[in-house]
Amino acid sequence: MPWTRRHLLTLEELSREEIDQIHATAAAFKRTLSRRVKKVPALRGKTIVNLFLEPSTRTRMAFDMAAKRLSADVISFDAASSSTTKGETLHDTAKNIQALGADMIVIRHAAAGSPLYLSRILDIPVINAGDGAHEHPTQGLLDTFTMKEHLGSLKGRKIVILGDILFSRVARSNIHALTKLGANVTLVGPATLVPHWFTDLGVEVSHDLRTALADAEVVMLLRIQHERQSSGHFPSLGEYTSMFGLNKTRASWLNPKAIIMHPGPINRGVEIDSDLADGDHSVILEQVNNGIAVRMAALYLCAGGQPENVAPIE
C-alpha cells in the first residue's frame, strides 16, 4: 500500500502495516550503508532542520547522519545560542524556520504534544524526536527493527521492559509498536514507576522481577528519568538496583538466547551491570547503528518517498 503520512508524530496512530513498511524501507537503506559509498540521492535539494530543544546525543547525531546519507542539507538548531534564550516562542521559532525555506523539521521538546502542535501550524512535514514523556517514535521503530533482525516475527514473543516506565517516552512508543506487532509485553519495576493502569495499553504489569524475566526473549532496560520526576519514587538508587538492577544472576533467568537492549544513556551499575551491557547478549550498539537506517526511512517517507521506490535507489 502507498505511504500517505506527511508527519511521524506517534506510533499509537500507525497501523501494523505502516510499521512494517518503515521497517522494510529501513532494511533497504541499511544495505546501502554497507557499501563503499553510503550516500543515496533520495533527498538531494531538501533542507532538514533538527530542532532539538532538549539534550540529545544518539538521536540528534543519527538524524544528522540519516539526512546526510540521503543527500539532504542539514541544519542542526543550537538552542543555547538561539533566540529561544531571549523568550522567543516555539510557534515563532518554527514559523521562522519554515519562512527560511526548510523542507522538514525534526523536533525534540520537553513538552508533550509539541510535534503535534507544529504539524498543525506548519505546511512542512514534522517528525517527533521525543516530546516529554509522551512518545519517541523513531526509537520504538529502531528497537522493534532490531528485535525483528534477531527474532524474526515478534508475534507471541515474550518482551520485558524493565525500569522507569512512568516517565519514559521510549516505553510508550515500544508498547504501541510491540502490541501492534503481536508481541507479549510485560512491564516490570517498582509500583511507583510501573502503575497498574498501563494494562489498559494491552500489556502485563509485574513487580516480581524473577517471574517477569523467566524465559523472556528480550529485556529492555530503561534508566531512571530524574529530569522528569518532581518527587522521589523510590528511596535511593542503591535500593532500586538491589531490587530491579539487571546483573548476571538475574540475567540467568532469561531465555538462554535472549537479547539485552537499552535505548541509552546507560546508568552503568544502576539499571544494568557493565559486564552485561558490554556482553555477548547485548545488542545496544546495534540499536544505535540501526537508528540511522530507520531514521533514513522516516525522513524519506515523510518527504514523499514510497517504500517500493527504495530498491532502485540502491
Curated annotation (Swiss-Prot):
One of its GO terms (cellular component) is cytosol. InterPro entries: Asp/Orn_carbamoyltranf_P-bd, Asp/Orn_carbamoylTrfase, Asp/Orn_carbamoylTrfase_sf, Asp_carbamoyltransf, Asp_carbamoyltransf_Asp/Orn-bd. Its EC number is 2.1.3.2. Carbamoyl phosphate binds at R58, T59, R108, H136, Q139, G264, P265. It is an enzyme of class 2 (transferase). GO terms for molecular function: amino acid binding; aspartate carbamoyltransferase activity. One of its GO terms (biological process) is amino acid metabolic process. Keywords: Pyrimidine biosynthesis, Transferase. L-aspartate binds at K86, R169, R223. Heterododecamer (2C3:3R2) of six catalytic PyrB chains organized as two trimers (C3), and six regulatory PyrI chains organized as three dimers (R2). Belongs to the aspartate/ornithine carbamoyltransferase superfamily. ATCase family. Catalyzes the condensation of carbamoyl phosphate and aspartate to form carbamoyl aspartate and inorganic phosphate, the committed step in the de novo pyrimidine nucleotide biosynthesis pathway. This is Aspartate carbamoyltransferase catalytic subunit. The lineage of its organism: Bacteria, Pseudomonadati, Verrucomicrobiota, Opitutia, Opitutales.
